Amino acid sequence: LIIGILTSLFCSIFITRLLIEGVVNKWGKISFSRKWSENLMGNAHFDFLGKSKISYIVMIVVLAVSCVSFAVRGLNMGAEFTGGRAYVIRFDRPVQAEEVRMKLQDVFSGYEDAANVSFEVKQYGNENQMRIVTQYKYDDTSDEATSEVDRILYDALHGLYGYPITFENFRNTQNDINGILTADKIGPSIAKDMTWGAIWSVLFSLIAIGLYISLRFKKWQYATGATTALAFNALVVIGVFSLCYGWLPFNLEVNQAFIAAILTIIGYTINDTVVVFDRIREYLVLYPKRDLRENVNNALNATLSRTINTSGTTLVTLLAILFFGGETIRGFIFALALGVVVGTLSTLFVATPIAYGLMKREGLGKK
């Protein structure tokens, strides 16, 4: 993300300028729109603040449904947060993570107590090494349970080798360089530490962004609106994962990738919110005699085109990956796509109305 941001900044400042200057020098003029899109959303006059009561009701209902689902169904927690076993397995040829995942799924589905157990497959180092994390019998630390998991892995993966590897050689690399290189148990204490680490990372990001907004706009009302909207976004995504896991045709597991998605959503959404708040601050300076409500509504309408275009292009890319990408990243991409949609709506109907309401209560807006 950092590399992408820096690259985009460099291209916007230098490359785009050179291209525009080249076009202008050659043809004398340049157009940034078509006739059909020239005034698209340019003269919008939506009364966003007039719908604030409705938006608050919808927000409360959505949060209530999310909380009920979380209390009743819970979340499909990954092995990082519940405990489990982590393996690094070496093959004698390059293999794909999706290929390994499909083999594991076929074998695990044949075990009655393992049919709904989630597992994670990632390339580890070389193309012929995979890291596999499974929750199967995570609460059983006996040697018998470990041997059973080893046997399941062998049954699933021995066909991917170019020679008939035995179960003993698969478990022990002293006689064969291929097979299980490392096998670790993720105990309850480690899982608990990782759970709290994930929670603190999200809370810290919200606090840091709240402080940044307070310092940038010098009004706590903006920070309150922004952080409330960000927390709402995170809770809605978590609620949808709780409500929909087991119903959608792909895995909605809450793992470290999901936490990364939540943090990405928080960072992405705040961009839209800052753009709107910047325009509100600008209008308050340019039109100090206008009513605060009018300035805020005008700011929302003025930035609406930018908000929709930015979110729309991002969403198109995410949907393409969601539908045509690999199974292992669909849960992560689904969380991002959902976060983009919810984040856009929360900027318009949560963050700004809350900031406006607090500013109005304090008698601000005409300074």
Q: Where would I find each of the regions flagged by the language model?
A:
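A structural signal for conserved, well-ordered secondary-structure elements
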Residues: L1-K367
